[in-house]
UniProtKB/Swiss-Prot annotation:
Keywords: Chaperone, Cytoplasm, DNA replication, Metal-binding, Repeat, Stress response, Zinc, Zinc-finger. This is Chaperone protein DnaJ. SMART domains: DnaJ. One of its GO terms (cellular component) is cytoplasm. One of its GO terms (biological process) is chaperone cofactor-dependent protein refolding. InterPro entries: DnaJ, DnaJ_C, DnaJ_domain, DnaJ_domain_CS, HSP40/DnaJ_pept-bd, HSP_DnaJ_Cys-rich_dom, HSP_DnaJ_Cys-rich_dom_sf, J_dom_sf.
Length: 375
């Protein structure tokens, strides 16, 4: 019959401390001791608890058990050498990984590491994106706990060097292979690879050394930013780990649409209405731009769709490469609801032009009947 997991037997997790393992053993040994518990199977359970405790309370045995479980790494190599037996619960991948360094090349858990980057989405008006601005934003991020100065330990105490790994954050485990014994390095499960153990945790941060706070950051938005672009604010991300540098803050811009202007890169586009008289006779009109009103001369005979350009009236290039232009497309508006006098003037114009229109007024139903008759 296969043996139960020792951690399961004692009812503790795999990262349990020695004190937690000892406490669990005392409770269960008292419960199942043959002199106290006369139920059938109690003696076997007591034996199982004792065996689990003897293994997990010994650092070397525990490390060996964590590596191999209940399997004996030497089994399968008795008198027959390689013949017929298995390799003690591990495969050739594990063997070669250990021998040739695959398992040893691990990042030092105590090495300085850069903090995580943060992202903040900012909504800008059309004009704010065009001209830029200075603003203050507030972001939630982790800060060093002021109570413990980031140590994670209760004030008046300090983290202690892990007695199991000597502060390295790693344990050396001896592994038997068909090629001999190999020493493999694993993350120390007593300190989770930190090399430190905190016996008395800070009540403010719970031992993490960090607390969540909202921080105000001044941001200078350059002129010419566009929708979807982002601004990097160096060093304003999450704080570094083990003395490493802080991460960065990335501000992503969302630019609102304008009711009159449209933007394409650094250029601005808009439509301007012209009356029939303005288009035919020409005129000087006022055109709104981001920089104020500008006079534009419209030549006589201008047609719908004619384009004009106002140089330098667009958006500044965000990288400083000049200034965009403003493009104007004119639309000639056909007059409606004419007075009789206006109609007479247009009739005169049409007659002089030799293009007198047919002004027969028909009802909608008359037009439908005429269409069916083919008139």
């Amino acid at each position: 019959m296969s043996k139960r997991d020792y951690y399961e037997v004692l009812g503790v997790g795999k990262s349990a401390s020695k004190d937690e393992i000892k406490k669990a053993y005392r409770k269960l040994s008292k419960k199942y001791h043959p002199d106290i518990n006369k139920e059938a199977g109690a003696a076997e359970k007591f034996k199982e608890v004792k065996e689990a405790y003897e293994t997990l309370s010994d650092d070397q045995k525990r490390a060996h058990y964590d590596q191999f479980g209940h399997t004996d790494p030497n089994q399968g190599f008795g008198g027959g050498g390689f013949g017929g037996g298995d390799f003690g619960g591990f495969g050739f991948d594990d063997i070669f990984s250990s021998i040739f360094g695959g398992g040893a090349r691990r990042r030092d858990p105590n090495a300085p590491r850069q903090g995580a980057d943060l992202q903040y989405t900012m909504t800008l008006s059309f004009e704010e994106a065009a001209f830029g601005k200075e603003t203050t934003i507030e972001i939630p991020r982790e800060e060093t706990c002021e109570t413990c100065s980031g140590s994670g330990a209760k004030p008046g105490t300090k983290p202690e060097t892990c007695s199991h790994c000597g502060g390295s954050g790693q344990l050396n485990m001896e592994q038997s292979t068909p090629f001999g014994k190999v020493v493999n390095r694993r993350v120390c499960h007593y300190c989770n690879g930190t090399g430190k153990q905190i016996k008395h945790k800070c009540s403010t941060c719970g031992g993490t050394g960090k607390v969540k706070k909202r921080k105000k950051i001044n941001v200078t938005i350059p002129a010419g930013v566009d929708d979807g672009q982002q601004l990097r604010v160096a060093g304003q991300g999450e704080p570094g780990i083990n003395g490493g540098p802080s991460g960065d803050l990335f501000v992503v811009f969302r630019v609102q649409e304008h009711e009159f202007f449209e933007r394409d890169g650094d250029d601005i586009y808009c439509e301007m209405p012209l009356t029939f008289a303005q288009a035919a006779l020409g005129d000087e009109i006022e055109v709104p731009t981001l920089h104020g009103k500008v006079k534009l001369k419209v030549p006589a005979g201008t047609q719908t769709g004619t384009k004009f350009r106002l140089k330098g009236k667009g958006v500044a290039n965000v990288r400083g490469y000049g200034q965009g232009d403003q493009h104007i497309v004119v639309r000639v508006v056909t007059p409606t609801n004419l007075t009789e006098n206006q109609k007479n003037i247009l009739r005169e114009f049409a007659e002089v032009s030799g293009n007198m229109p047919d002004e027969q007024e028909m009802s909608f139903f008359d037009k439908v009947k005429r269409a069916f008759k083919g008139d």
